[in-house]
Amino acid sequence: SFLKIGDRAAGAIKSGGTTRRAAKMVCLDLDHPEIELFIDWKVEEEKKVGALISAGYASDYEGEAYRTVSGQNSNNSVRIPNEFFEKLEKGEDWELTARSDGRIMKKVPSKALWDKIAYAAWRCADPGTQYDTTINEWHTSPKGGRIRASNPCSEYMFLDNTACNLASVNLRKFFNESDNTIDVEGFEHTVRLWTVVLEISVLMAQFPSKEVAQLSYD
């Protein structure tokens, strides 16, 4: 599938001698007809890893066992609307629908699907969960369109074809242990300064497409 092709492409970028490995987020709506396969993808692949390690292959993440299987070059997440949790509370089935015309392709017990997500997350740390309804309720630019995905680590949610640069602030530097106070003014100044710095860095970046460049600028 194209999902596995994208995974291999990211792996090639990672091993291409660059200073930073590829970063890729893959999101799938919970009502997608192939959602069960998506949830189980890494679970099944890591079973193969276990078999290869038992056969004597290296167990480190850069070793042959992990390089051999798919699904190791992205963060996978499922987009869950509030409607699913309503079905879950009532013990009702969840409908999987065709992307082209919305036809119901299959009904699955909502609890079984939720248990599958929980088991997969425990077994191999994926998929992550993104709460689609809440994310779009908190959308700061709703007229621009729906938020359908995030950056690879899921801390930045925004429109399709937009870019983000990230920074971190050491909060301990603003905390005075002698009197248990926080330098609020210093923190506010730092946040304002870094917001400007990141805006400039985004605008100075080289974008992969005209659409990404324009929406990042706007």
Regions found by a protein language model. Name each.
Residues 189-198:
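Long, compositionally biased non-active-site segments enriched in small/hydrophobic residues and glycine
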Residues 1-189, 203-217:
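Active-site cavity-forming subdomains of large catalytic enzyme subunits
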